[in-house]
Amino acid sequence: MHQQNGDRSCANEAIGGAHYGPVLVYMSKVADASTADGSTPFFKVFQDTWAKNSGGGGGSDDYWGTKDLNKNCGKMDVKIPTNLAPGDYLLRAEAIALHAAGSANGAQFYITCYQITVTGSGSSSPAGVSFPGAYKATDPGIQINIYQNLASYVAPGPAVIAGGTEAVAGSAGSAVTATGGAPVATATATTMRTSAVVTSAAAVPTNGGGSGACSVTRCFRTYLQGRR
């Protein structure tokens, strides 16, 4: 994920302009990723959200997933849970910028979608949430003043599924440092094959938070009020 298409240079911020907030990844099981329309339920497999910086001032000095994204030159290591059933999936990766989120509709959503095929011996088919509908503009992790002294942060959306990953924001090295839920052992390791990646992009204004769903016809970044 990078604000400049195809750019992975550390000389350029992946998300600039103090766009601090969480990085979340969802997946959705579909019959055929090449024709899926994004209406199937999505479950969360990864999140890198917030951690307190004891030496900082307000929440903007704290550790955030988007800061890790910048530190890693726009790349985030995300492990596909090994317990997932094989087949086609849509993958929704999003960064939520909270620098203007002190009032409703101030958060900004940057979303990328992929079509992937998972292979392996897993059997889990987690329940999910729908987009639009999973977020509200007034959710505590979406409408928040990050410039105050934060004691905690509530990540938007559902919990990470068993076998997914909850990263520790601000950790040295790879952003992936902690496992969310209880991983389920499988006899054969799960692998991922990217079957199709949508390359077109457009800014889609919304007013309800997370109203953009993954679709094979578009790969977009969406903003609550259509602005950066």
Region spans (language model):
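A short tyrosine-centered beta-strand micro-motif
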Residues: 89-93
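Short acidic/polar micro-motifs centered on Gly/Asp/Asn
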Residues: 79-80, 97
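A glycine-anchored, Pro-Gly-centered beta-turn/N-cap motif
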Residues: 80, 85-87
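Peripheral, solvent-exposed domain-edge segments
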Residues: 1-23, 30-75, 98-228
